[in-house]
């Protein structure tokens, strides 16, 4: 029997009201995603790399991923491409809010990790941060992780697109969903160990190409 913390109509109303405020979406995700986060936690426990991530609990912060240092790496590395992505958009990994509404510390870390690797997913999938690109990434996250916040962003966000973007999304969805289902489980990727990895090789090893 599947559990739901918040009824869908209530969540849709929230998303419409705040679309898409980072803080409100983050709170919504924590409140509605508890049982999905438990499922993600179990999948991580069943994988050796996932186990190491849960044991080490690495964080993605301005201190652990120093942009200026990343930009000194070879241009073809994952680290350099992530650093360029963040610098070009004036983003900071420190802007991600801390999980507050998941009382279990282990599950709170899992959800924090999900939020902190979001920009890595953008880089790996080669999608920017426009509304259209963000929605495509949310469809990928929905297919892989099943989180209610990603699901609502994917579906409700699609209505915010213009006609041309909606048509483009319909053409893109089969491919992005296929990539989500065939690729490695993104929460079991120890990104910190791939800073110097050629980004094309990383995409291939994760079956994202």
UniProtKB/Swiss-Prot annotation:
<keyword id="KW-0479">Metal-binding</keyword>
<keyword id="KW-0472">Membrane</keyword>
<feature type="binding site">
    <location>
        <position position="134"/>
    </location>
    <ligand>
        <name>Zn(2+)</name>
    </ligand>
</feature>
<keyword id="KW-0831">Ubiquinone biosynthesis</keyword>
<comment type="subunit">
    <text>Component of a multi-subunit COQ enzyme complex.</text>
</comment>
<feature type="binding site">
    <location>
        <position position="118"/>
    </location>
    <ligand>
        <name>Zn(2+)</name>
    </ligand>
</feature>
<feature type="binding site">
    <location>
        <position position="119"/>
    </location>
    <ligand>
        <name>Zn(2+)</name>
    </ligand>
</feature>
<keyword id="KW-0862">Zinc</keyword>
<keyword id="KW-0456">Lyase</keyword>
<feature type="binding site">
    <location>
        <position position="122"/>
    </location>
    <ligand>
        <name>Zn(2+)</name>
    </ligand>
</feature>
<protein>
    <recommendedName>
        <fullName>Ubiquinone biosynthesis protein COQ4 homolog 2, mitochondrial</fullName>
        <ecNumber>4.1.1.130</ecNumber>
    </recommendedName>
</protein>
<dbReference type="InterPro" id="IPR027540">
    <property type="entry name" value="Coq4_euk"/>
</dbReference>
<dbReference type="Pfam" id="PF05019">
    <property type="entry name" value="Coq4"/>
</dbReference>
<dbReference type="GO" id="GO:0031314">
    <property type="term" value="C:extrinsic component of mitochondrial inner membrane"/>
</dbReference>
<keyword id="KW-0999">Mitochondrion inner membrane</keyword>
<comment type="pathway">
    <text>Cofactor biosynthesis; ubiquinone biosynthesis.</text>
</comment>
<dbReference type="GO" id="GO:0006744">
    <property type="term" value="P:ubiquinone biosynthetic process"/>
</dbReference>
<comment type="function">
    <text>Lyase that catalyzes the C1-decarboxylation of 4-hydroxy-3-methoxy-5-(all-trans-polyprenyl)benzoic acid into 2-methoxy-6-(all-trans-polyprenyl)phenol during ubiquinone biosynthesis.</text>
</comment>
<dbReference type="InterPro" id="IPR007715">
    <property type="entry name" value="Coq4"/>
</dbReference>
<comment type="similarity">
    <text>Belongs to the COQ4 family.</text>
</comment>
<keyword id="KW-0496">Mitochondrion</keyword>
């Amino acid at each position: 029997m599947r559990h739901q913390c918040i009824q869908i109509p209530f969540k849709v109303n929230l998303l419409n009201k705040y679309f898409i405020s980072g803080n409100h979406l983050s709170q919504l995700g924590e409140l509605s995603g508890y049982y999905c986060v438990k499922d993600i936690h179990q999948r991580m426990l069943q994988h050796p790399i996932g186990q190491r991530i849960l044991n080490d609990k690495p964080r993605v912060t301005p201190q652990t991923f120093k942009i200026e240092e990343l930009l000194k790496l070879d241009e073809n590395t994952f680290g350099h491409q992530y650093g360029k992505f963040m610098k070009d958009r004036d983003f900071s990994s420190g802007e991600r809010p801390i999980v507050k509404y998941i009382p279990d510390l282990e599950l709170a870390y899992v959800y924090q990790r999900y939020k902190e690797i979001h920009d890595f997913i953008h880089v790996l999938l080669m999608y920017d941060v426009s509304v259209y690109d963000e929605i495509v990434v949310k469809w990928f996250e929905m297919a892989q992780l099943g989180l209610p916040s990603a699901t609502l962003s994917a579906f409700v966000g699609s209505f915010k697109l213009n006609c041309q973007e909606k048509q483009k999304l319909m053409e893109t969805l089969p491919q992005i969903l296929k990539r989500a289902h065939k690729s490695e489980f993104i929460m079991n990727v120890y990104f910190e160990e791939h800073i110097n990895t050629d980004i094309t090789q990383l995409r291939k090893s994760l079956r994202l190409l």
